[in-house]
């Protein structure tokens, strides 16, 4: 048994060390998107760093996934026993973190610091990120190793948290299409790619609609209660809009749906009418006009239904609740 386990164990150890080394040397200049720090240095991120960070990370992840799949496949063929938990989940979680971190940080920046350049970068990189995510979630060797471990007598010796992790992975992979074959698998992956693009379009419409909405306030009574810092931001926005003499003390103030402006208004402003106006504008954002998301939402709902049926569910509600504590019957 030890002779059979040693190659897989060696791969597992190598994987855990290779990520840090490969990512550290992926680019000649330190890239903050690859920084191994407790808090990401977002202030140092520039658009030109995104593409090399994501692409180098994906390249490392592709190779690491191949190594893991080969090791697991060899183990599954050579030994009828279960693959130990330590040789499946730790390298798998390391893989999730390594390839997902730069893309996740970029997605956050895209949401809070949107620009045409960042949108173009997202459009260029998204297909490769989605494709790798599909390959990872539909990996037969990983699924088979997890399934064998779940069905083995040694599963009972795992901690409750470890058992939960194995079962959650199995469920996530089933919902990710691992059991689909042939035309169904191709259709599922095609729909997932379309859904990713639609989700991006939805977010873009929301950002554009938020950016298009604003109000200029001129009376002090209208902004009573709003913190001074928020008023300075609103006055600065007014100056940029052409009100050169705008000040935090005397206005005018330009308020928008940006969180740094809207949140203080909704929390502290004594002007009930202004709070209601901004709340309703935020609640109905991208529901009409040039950035209307109505058709995008219809397509998203349609694809969700198609995916649910491909996975054996009657509707998307059942699919969504499959990962939640409440059952479908409990909420319908």
Question: What are these language model-derived features?
Answer:
Residues 1-10:
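Classical eukaryotic N-terminal signal peptides for Sec-dependent ER targeting/secretion
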Residues 4, 17, 25-26:
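Positively charged, low-complexity intrinsically disordered regions
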Residues 21-332:
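Zn2+-dependent metallopeptidase catalytic domains
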